[in-house]
Amino acid sequence: MPVSNHAMIFVTAMPRLAASAAKIAVLLPLCPPDPASFSSLMPPRIGGDSRAANRDGAVTPPRSSEEPAAPTLLYLSESDVRAAFTADVAHASQHAAFIALGRGEALLPARLLLPGRGDDVAFCYAARAEASAPAVSKFGSVHAGNVDAGLPAVHALVTVLDPTTGVPTCVMAGTTLTTRRTAAASAVAMEALWSPDSSGRDDVRVADGAGVGARDGTGVHVAIVGSGVQAEAHALCAVGGEHTVGRIRLAARDRASADELVARWHTTRPEGAPDMELVDTVEQACADADVIAVCTTSTTPVLEATWVRDGALVISVGSFSAERSEVPSDLVAQARVVVDDRETALADNGCVVAALMAGVLETGSVETLGEVLVRDAAHADDDDAERHVWNDDSSNNGVTNHGAADSDAGAHGERRPRVTLYASVGIGLQDAAAAVAVQEAAQRAGVGTPLPL
């Protein structure tokens, strides 16, 4: 057989390798090595000192063989979130969120909607309050039929990432967070968009400290449409706001659910809060109401423009997709329209989309809550500054729409709106602000379960 080149090289080199080995064998006994010079190559003695001496005799610690501590993930259950996300924490988080949005600091990509069977929809949000803030995502769904099965209509999970490393630091149940952040944002809107002057009310006073209402009938008259978790949350936020609440009326399609809510309210309401009166129709609930919170998942309007008094604030939180419109376009046409986020509302708020398609609303007249808050904050120390609230007896809140009557023209020729509409879709920035606040509150209180990643 032919011999390969590699084999020939090996055979040729063998005599030279043998001669070199013989020389090394002769020299080694004459030059014994310093054991310290090879200590780094030798395994440590079992049970002995594993530290290595350097050439100067100094002892240096060995390089740690342990891996860095594995990061942990804080898990917050619904009960954990309820404990940490108090009314004060919720309100502060939402006020800060909209201020950041109004200043242009927040990072808010478009949300994702994934339709399902019937009216079911899955959603995904992501946002951060600023570039150096934690990134937060929320993935969940809305299943209106869950109510009949005794389950919440909304389920979600929220994840918070470390702003420096991107490592997930917290994951929390998102149902309570979504409910409370939505209602807290409505409370922020109520404080910014409604005043006693707008409704011609002279019997409404600023609430003291804990002040939640006036049970003698004076104070803000609130109407709640719907009987789900948002209805209850909005009632709680209303009585915890800056103005006293004198009356709460409730109207809902589901009478049994409404009865349960009223019974629960009478036993758990904050001290000093007024009774919740259950009425038969939405029209009855809206009669003389200063603030109307529409908290349904209806795809069609649930109230009429003629039921809403001049100067009222209508809060709509159920039209979170283009196919849902709980407020009629003729009422939108008469309103100053304020939304949580302009781009989101123009694409996905059913009330806004329907009014745009009907030609009774122009995109340029739509304001955002963040813009209002930033503008008002800038003018807070200027008593003569325009606060975008019409304060005479014949009008209401500020910069308008094109559906109001010409007879309502303001000093600069604008058409004054008859009412104000806060139309909320819900945005990821609200979740980001809420989740970070919940995580911080939970860590301070020692709430939650650490999990290894």
Label the model's feature ranges.
Residues 271-360:
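Rossmann-like adenosine-cofactor binding region
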Residues 197, 323-392, 406-453:
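Adenosine-phosphate binding glycine-rich loop
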